[in-house]
Amino acid sequence: MAFQPTEHPVLALPSQERMREFKKRGKKGLDELVEIFKKREELIQLERNDPFRYGFEPPNWGDADELWADASELLIQGGNRAGKSEYAAKKVIRMLTGKKNAKVWVLGMTAQSSIRDQQPLIYKYIPEEWKNLRKTKVQNVSYSQKNGFTENTFVFPNGSQCWFMNYSQEMRVIEGGEVDLIWADELVPLQWIQTLRYRLITRSGKLLVTFTPVDGYTPTVKEYINGMKILETKESPLLPDSVNVPGCEIGHMPYVAEGRKASSKIIWFFTSMNPYNPITEMEKTLKGETSIQIKLRAYGFAQNLTGNQFPKFCHVHLLAPED
């Protein structure tokens, strides 16, 4: 049976032209080509088996890491299937593996959505050798696809522990705890955000918020976006001909911003930034949609549609007194 290389969105196959160059060099060239294919297959298998160590990280993940280093809160708004939850899940595991006795909360909409969406991603990024640990007085990692993590928690050999909670619970479940990292995913209520901040003070923890703003300009979105300073923009091929957001040049959307507090940072993960998700399907789906929907679904940006007296007024119109 002929060898069939595994498809991969990042690890490209040698071009036909390059393979012909190897063939011209005879057996030595063909042997080198075989090694290239073999190494590629090995890398793909490593990524499948241990994505924590060998998974591909797109450039926007590195940009988010830089913001994270100097921020106490990071909001990642993203288009559909932009990879924001993948990033957050890996960030959770980095904290749990990198700090002894770390404490992390992972919050979602409901218990069911936590088992369906967040917990499989967290399990995916657990280092391979820790996925099937023998239970002891400390370590306990028990997961099933049907029920998620046993009792909505797990503990690593280094004493680090993660708990899963959701916004359908009474808010008192988050009173009194002290944690190093909180990941709040999808439509977190503002009242929860305001309470969660106090759970991070003692351990100098950080808050990571991720969602696609499908409900528009909610109080939580306003908490971060209102009064922000756009630091960087990127081209928006699906919206190329107009000023899409005040403070951006024509044909661009916000990419990085600073919130009203300098310790609060914002980054937008565009759907096109995730190589594992075919952007062509998103383009087909959004064809004929309004610019509001395109901004939201492809770029993760929620537009404030309330009747502001000066709707195009933003930080770029503010001048220092000497100006």
Report each predicted region and the residues it spans.
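Phosphate/NTP-binding elements of NTP-utilizing enzymes
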Residues: 2-323
